């Protein structure tokens, strides 16, 4: 039995993250609310973890070891977080916003990405632990 809710949750969450991000840019939420960026990275990490778990359930038949699933999910979250931070750094360099302050921000972003991934993994792992693995 495959948990059909994973794909549904992942699609709904990515749509919500996209709407929140576009709204934040247009309404300057990232400037007005300093915590908003952390929330968005948490949700982004959560979404990546959902997508990774969906991939595992649909394409990897041997997934019984929860530690291997956890490592896979967190590595996916970190990989996407690092790619996003490289993108952000490139954009900041392109528009000439730079400085050492971007390093602590990048570290904070990666921490919140990872926290979102961990929370998503724990929730999904708990909801699916009684399902039969195919």
Report the location of each language-model feature:
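Bulky hydrophobic segments
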Residues: 1-104, 114-134
């Amino acid at each position: 039995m495959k948990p059909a809710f994973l794909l549904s949750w992942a699609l709904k969450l990515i749509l919500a993250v996209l709407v929140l991000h576009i709204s934040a840019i247009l309404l300057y939420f990232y400037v007005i609310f300093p915590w908003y960026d952390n929330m968005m990275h948490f949700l982004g990490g959560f979404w990546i973890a959902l997508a990774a778990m969906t991939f595992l359930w649909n394409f990897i038949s041997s997934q019984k070891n929860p530690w291997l699933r956890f490592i896979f999910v967190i590595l996916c979250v970190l990989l996407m977080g690092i790619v996003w931070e490289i993108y952000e750094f490139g954009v900041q360099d392109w528009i000439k916003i730079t400085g050492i302050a971007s390093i602590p921000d990048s570290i904070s972003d990666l921490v919140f990405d990872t926290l979102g991934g961990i929370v998503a993994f724990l929730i999904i792992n708990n909801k699916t632990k009684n399902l039969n693995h195919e």
